[in-house]
Structure formats: C-alpha cells, structure tokens
Amino acid sequence: AAPGSSPHQVYNITWEVTNGDRETVWAISGNHPLWTWWPVLTPDLCMLALHGPPHWGLEYQAPYSSPPGPPCCSGSGGSSPGCSRDCNEPLTSLTPRCNTAWNRLKLDQVTHKSSEGFYVCPGSHRPREAKSCGGPDSFYCASWGCETTGRAYWKPSSSWDYITVDNNLTTNQAVQVCKDNKWCNPLAIQFTNAGRQVTSWITGHYWGLRLYVSGQDPGLTFGIRLKYQNLGPRVPIGPNPVLADQLSFPLPNPLPKPAKSPPVSNSTPTMISPSPTPTQPPPAGTGDRLLNLVQGAYQALNLTNPDKTQECWLCLVSGPPYYEGVAVLGTYSNHTSAPTNCSVASQHKLTLSEVTGRGLCIGTVPKTHQALCNTTLKTNKGSYYLVAPAGTTWACNTGLTPCLSATVLNRTTDYCVLVELWPRVTYHPPSYVYSQFEKSYRHKR
C-alpha cells in the first residue's frame, strides 16, 4: 500500500507499456487496491516499435498513431483505393515490419510460425551473473541463454522473471485484422508469481524482444510501469475548519421599545395586535456539538452509575487517540466492484488495542485478539469488497478502513473487527481536579 494508508484503500491504477524511449504506447486502468490487480497486458508488437529502431519502419511514428501504410488489395483487380499488394498472395518472412498492411501480415507469419517466432530477455532486474546479456543496444539478448520467455520452438522460460509474453491472437484471427489495415500483432503479457511479489513497478522494469528469423534477429526494447492516483477527496490547505465553524455566544435579545401614546381622537380606536415573528434557532456549531457529546456521556453515566455523577468532571481528551472503538455485530454488504467510499482514506487513527467489546471479526485473528470476536468469518477466494454498514468501520491490524478487499485479506495476514467509533471522554472525581488546580497555584518560597 501507499505509505501511511490502509492496504484496502482503492486507487485508480494504470498499467502502462512503454517503448524504447519510455513513452507510453498502451495503457489500461481500473480501480483497485495496490498490488491486487494484475491484468493481461495486450499491446500490439508494432506499438512497441513506435519511435523505435529503423528496421520496423515506425521510427517517425508517434505513440498512439494509427497503423500506417497502404492497405492490402482485395484481389488481383486492386479494388481498394491506394492498395499496394494483394494480401492473398503467398507471403515470405523477408522484412517482417510494421509500416504497411502487407508487412504486418509478414510479421504475423513470423511470430506464429513454429520454426520462427520471437524471444524476450530481461533488463536490469536480471541476476548479476547474467553479465553477457548486454544492454539495450543488443536488446538485452547479446548471447543465447538470456531469454526468459517468448514464442519460439525451444520454449524459453524462467522461474524468476516477472512476465511471460505470447501472441494474443491466432494466426487466422490476425490475418483478417491485418487485411483490415489495423494493428494485427497483439501480444499477451502476463505477470508471473514472481512479478506479483515485487512492488517496484512504479519505477518500471524493462525487456528486449527479438524476432527469430534467418540472418540477424531484429529487435526492440519495451517497459512496464504502474501509476496510481488517490480517488479520495482532496483536503484543502487553509484555515482550520473546526475553528471557523465555532459560533459566537448569542447576544441577548434587545428590550422592546415603549409604545408611543396614540394621539387623542374622537374616532373609535381599533386594536391591532402585532403578528409574532417566528425565530429560527441558530445551527449548532462545533462547540455545541462537542458539549452535546459530553452531555450524552453524562446522561449514560447517570443512568448506569448515578452515584458517580453527584460531583464529577467529564472531559474530552486533548491528545490522540481521540476515539475508542466499540466492537459490534452488523450486516456488511458485498460488492464485486469497489464502491466510492472504498477510495476514501480514513481521517481517524486507531489501533486494535483501543477497541473494546465483542463483535464481528474477519480474517485469521490471532489468539491475542480473539477476545474481540463474537463471530469470526472466513473470506472466500475471489475479487470482491466487504463494505461496513452505516455508522461503522473496519478496525484492522493495518488501520481503519470503510471497506475490505477480499484479495488483500486472502494474500496477507490482515484481520479486522467491525467497530463503532466514539470520542474518548475521561471521568475525573472532584478530588483529582481540585488537586490539579492546587498545584498550579502553589509557589516556591
């Protein structure tokens, strides 16, 4: 998770695939907690060649450009305007490139052919002993044995690399897309178990890809990185809203002015009574609300222990933690996609040591905290969210959160209890308060 946040907090996450110049050429976004969403990335092979090496024919094409070059002809008559070749002619694997529909068809043939294909070599995250693999100039594939994935007859693989790369379309599917003059060589990049364990995707990782053809194998480099954005409301920098919200003491109502004596008249007087003007009570300010909290605590104490309220002091604490959690039972809601409040960071801080009572627990609760649990639920596998009912929140060993990610619960040792948050009000007998005042008035002789 982001520093200081709950691992269950939902962010807008974007996985980006970059070219050799580290420009974004393909991206996919979704709302998920960090390190729980590992989609299949499907950029086209030719997208990686945008602004790339001259071999691919796209060195002057910017990222997100449309497929260049003339389309294929529909037949020997050449009915498509501006077409260059009949795409039904026999293909050769010579010059598989990206600059025309005809050459993209050749590239499709190379990447799917059992005797040809492509292979991928990792960049700087490879083991230190792989010194002979070279750098980006050799596409990290300077010698055989550097490849960790790809689609080639020897089936390159690895137990430690972060991704696997394959074709995302069959050759028959790709042929039709190529004839429609579109990008037609999409890849399927999947994260391995090793790749799902690392959290360095924000800075990015890089690979090289080379075609396996006769002669020198042409290649390119590409990268994968993650970006995330907080979806919660931004807190403005400015005056303390609590101070601004406090209301001043109401001024006393002015005394009514004495009525003037009416002039003497021979006419019959008519009694006119003024209509009362309704007055709206002023809205409660922060001070009123805080006082109401203390009054509520007093009423609860007076009902349960009336002898304690004959003379006492009830105080709101002036230092953290300002709240206590009371474990409760409740019915949470289950959502397949993250609701809006899952992206809001909690404004309160609380640890499980400040929770009392017995309530609903979720996860693998250790023996040290099982006293908080009246009922303990296990989560099923899957990607879904458990939202606390209104007026409650989840108190977890990682902090407070309005909703839980089942993915996070299942891949970590996180455990949570459903709680209500109550302000901390301390009780002091009069002797304690008087002693504090006496200390402040004593002076050393």
UniProtKB/Swiss-Prot annotation:
Residues 1-445 are extracellular. Residues 253-286 are annotated as: Disordered. GO terms for cellular component: host cell plasma membrane; membrane; viral envelope; virion membrane. Glycans are attached at residues 12, 168, 266, 268, 273, 275, 277, 279, 302, 304, 309, 334, 341, 374, 410. The keyword Acetylation does not apply. A motif (CXXC) lies at residues 312-315. The keyword Disulfide bond applies. Zn(2+) binds at residues 55, 86. Keywords: Disulfide bond, Fusion of virus membrane with host cell membrane, Fusion of virus membrane with host membrane, Glycoprotein, Host cell membrane, Host membrane, Host-virus interaction, Membrane, Metal-binding, Viral attachment to host cell, Viral envelope protein, Viral penetration into host cytoplasm, Virion, Virus entry into host cell, Zinc. One of its GO terms (molecular function) is metal ion binding. GO terms for biological process: fusion of virus membrane with host plasma membrane; symbiont entry into host cell; virion attachment to host cell. Residues 262-274 have a biased composition (Low complexity). Pfam families: TLV_coat. Residues 275-284 have a biased composition (Pro residues). Disulfide bonds join 46-98, 72-87, 73-83, 121-141, 133-146, 178-184, 312-315, 342-396, 361-373, 403-416. Specific enzymatic cleavages in vivo yield mature proteins. Envelope glycoproteins are synthesized as an inactive precursor that is N-glycosylated and processed likely by host cell furin or by a furin-like protease in the Golgi to yield the mature SU and TM proteins. The cleavage site between SU and TM requires the minimal sequence [KR]-X-[KR]-R. InterPro entries: FMuLV_rcpt-bd, TLV/ENV_coat_polyprotein. It comes from the Viruses. PANTHER family: BC035947 PROTEIN-RELATED, VIRAL ENVELOPE PROTEIN. The mature envelope protein (Env) consists of a trimer of SU-TM heterodimers attached by a labile interchain disulfide bond. The surface protein (SU) attaches the virus to the host cell by binding to its receptor. This interaction triggers the refolding of the transmembrane protein (TM) and is thought to activate its fusogenic potential by unmasking its fusion peptide. Fusion occurs at the host cell plasma membrane. This is Envelope glycoprotein. It comes from Friend murine leukemia virus (FrMLV).
